[in-house]
Amino acid sequence: MTRIHASAVVDSKAELAGDVEIGPYSVIGPNVKIGAGTKVGSHTVIEGYTTIGKENNFAHFAAIGGPPQDMKYRGEPTQLIIGDHNTVREFTTIHTGTSQDEGITRIGNNNWIMAYVHIAHDCQVGNHTIFSSNAQIAGHVQVDDWVIMGGMSGVHQFVRVGQHAMLGGASALAQDIPPFVIAAGDKASPHGINVEGLKRRGFSSETISALRQAYKVLYKDGFSFEEAKVEIQKMVAASAADAATAEKLSQFHDFIAASTRGIIR
């Protein structure tokens, strides 16, 4: 049964599934859809064309689905789509997209978004990510699955953060982080493979060793960028007998090959 506090303001056109809870003084706009089992704390605003899945938990004073902070925005009906089983803590802001992109900001499933995080217009966030307190990502940023964003880190618009990567606290990121890599610094630079994180997620020692070798080829062995891509592609072919390792090496290679903004150096 849906439970709405007497002081909450829920527009009659909003669509709330069963077992949704809306806390005191929260505001739910007319174009909002909220899935079953989602809980919204007190003093939280959910507005815009926002669709939220099931079993999410929004803490107090979050601002979800507000218009993009983009001076080109002219009130187009852009969207925010949030998946299932996400935690969004206090004072987080997540904005809808813009017509200059696909018009949709997306948050996947099972993400942990801590207090004071900002996720700007048109961002694409995958699954199982962690945004530590005060992490801020600008418009059009893509954050892939299993990424960890350190506290007070900042990401420039249009940057991509590859799967299983980690950005250290108080870092400033202006170029792409390849998958599986740790980056840190006020001009974020690479600091090796995220070995501990990969172990926790069940990567084999063989796969981790291969990724460390690919990192060495890219960053340590003196190859040019084009030469490094060729060498890593050879590693993919040589690992064909180990499907899991070949897949991860291929993902590493394909990411750096596709980067348009350039990777961290």
Swiss-Prot record:
Locations listed in the record: Cytoplasm
Catalytic activity line of the entry: a (3R)-hydroxyacyl-[ACP] + UDP-N-acetyl-alpha-D-glucosamine = a UDP-3-O-[(3R)-3-hydroxyacyl]-N-acetyl-alpha-D-glucosamine + holo-[ACP]
Gene3D superfamilies the UniProt entry points to: Hexapeptide repeat proteins (2.160.10.10), Udp N-acetylglucosamine O-acyltransferase, C-terminal domain (1.20.1180.10)
A GO cellular-component term linked to this record: membrane
Top EC class of this enzyme: transferase
Transmembrane portions of the chain: none
Highest taxon in the source lineage: Bacteria
Example of a GO MF term: acyl-[acyl-carrier-protein]-UDP-N-acetylglucosamine O-acyltransferase activity
Enzyme Commission identifier(s): 2.3.1.129
Entry annotated with the keyword Acyltransferase: yes
Keywords from the UniProt entry: Acyltransferase, Cytoplasm, Lipid A biosynthesis, Lipid biosynthesis, Lipid metabolism, Repeat, Transferase
Keyword rRNA-binding: no
InterPro entries associated with the record: Acetyltransf_C (IPR029098), Acetyltransf_C_sf (IPR037157), Hexapep (IPR001451), Lipid_A_LpxA (IPR010137), Trimer_LpxA-like_sf (IPR011004)
Pfam name, any one: Hexapep
Pathway noted in the entry: Glycolipid biosynthesis; lipid IV(A) biosynthesis; lipid IV(A) from (3R)-3-hydroxytetradecanoyl-[acyl-carrier-protein] and UDP-N-acetyl-alpha-D-glucosamine: step 1/6
GO biological process: lipid A biosynthetic process
Record's function text: Involved in the biosynthesis of lipid A, a phosphorylated glycolipid that anchors the lipopolysaccharide to the outer membrane of the cell.
Assembly and oligomerization: Homotrimer.
The family this protein is said to belong to: Belongs to the transferase hexapeptide repeat family. LpxA subfamily.
Protein known as: Acyl-[acyl-carrier-protein]--UDP-N-acetylglucosamine O-acyltransferase
Organism field: Polynucleobacter necessarius subsp. necessarius (strain STIR1)
Gene name as annotated: lpxA
